[in-house]
Curated annotation (Swiss-Prot):
Function: Catalyzes the oxidation of 5,10-methylenetetrahydrofolate to 5,10-methenyltetrahydrofolate and then the hydrolysis of 5,10-methenyltetrahydrofolate to 10-formyltetrahydrofolate.
Organism in which the protein naturally occurs: Cellvibrio japonicus (strain Ueda107) (Pseudomonas fluorescens subsp. cellulosa)
InterPro entries: Aminoacid_DH-like_N_sf, NAD(P)-bd_dom_sf, THF_DH/CycHdrlase, THF_DH/CycHdrlase_cat_dom, THF_DH/CycHdrlase_CS, THF_DH/CycHdrlase_NAD-bd_dom
Protein name according to UniProt: Bifunctional protein FolD
EC number: 1.5.1.5, 3.5.4.9
Quaternary structure, from the entry: Homodimer.
Family from the record: Belongs to the tetrahydrofolate dehydrogenase/cyclohydrolase family.
Catalysed reactions, as listed in the record: (6R)-5,10-methylene-5,6,7,8-tetrahydrofolate + NADP(+) = (6R)-5,10-methenyltetrahydrofolate + NADPH; (6R)-5,10-methenyltetrahydrofolate + H2O = (6R)-10-formyltetrahydrofolate + H(+)
Pathway: One-carbon metabolism; tetrahydrofolate interconversion
GO CC list: cytosol
Presence of keyword Cytoplasm: no
Amino acid sequence: MSALVLDGKALAAKTEQELSQRVTALKARNGQTPILATILVGDDPASATYVKMKGNACTRIGMESIKVELPSSTTTEELLAKIQELNDNPNVHGILLQHPVPHQIDERLCFDAIAPEKDVDGVTCLGFGRMAMGEEAYGCATPKGIMRLLEAYNIEIAGKHAVVVGRSPILGKPMAMMLLNANATVTICHSRTRNLPDLIKQADIIVGAVGKPEFIKAEWIKDGAVVVDAGYHPGGVGDIELGPLVERAAAYTPVPGGVGPMTINTLIYQSVDSGEKKIR
């Protein structure tokens, strides 16, 4: 029997319809829409594309976006000043600082300068800590998108053994904490993990977040597992060797069309939520 496809593209499209209705209702009541401010430092083509995609997503649901573009020569102090300006603007409800920034900028310092209530991408240390403690906070967009996808397809998490391969601060670590908060038993693996195949074979839920094409082999994954691939590489492959799994996994995220669409969708979802809390 074929595995259940966790279709992030379809869920994102459905969610956009719901978000559009919420934005329309907000504008009808108050004459305002949520506003997301995106900050792009430098001229990296991939980053510019990602920022454009986020702006397009805002447009599709009828909310506004402000695009702040700064030169590659921008200093940490200049970027901090711009972030503070957006923090102080009551009409801005979400702030996104596009990663990566030029090498001379202290990216972590700038991330943490974003006001927690406007941290709709879930990048501040304060937001991460609050999320990890089970307090109200906006989650990192990709892992939060994965959790929303699992919930939408009624994937059971509580009591399951989840193995997360990857420990980045914006994916692997928050993913593990979100699964733990959902009552999974969580193992975090990384580049120095010994006996990685043996650990992965124990997983009821496997999340590939290692950033290497097809690094996780299909033969390492047991029958009936839920397979979540957060990677994307040239040729349309992810971090997991997916081919043989479509017939023996319980469920899987396709690449592309699984996790990717949920990342931007979650950013917009959290921006609308922030707007609803502030627009009276």
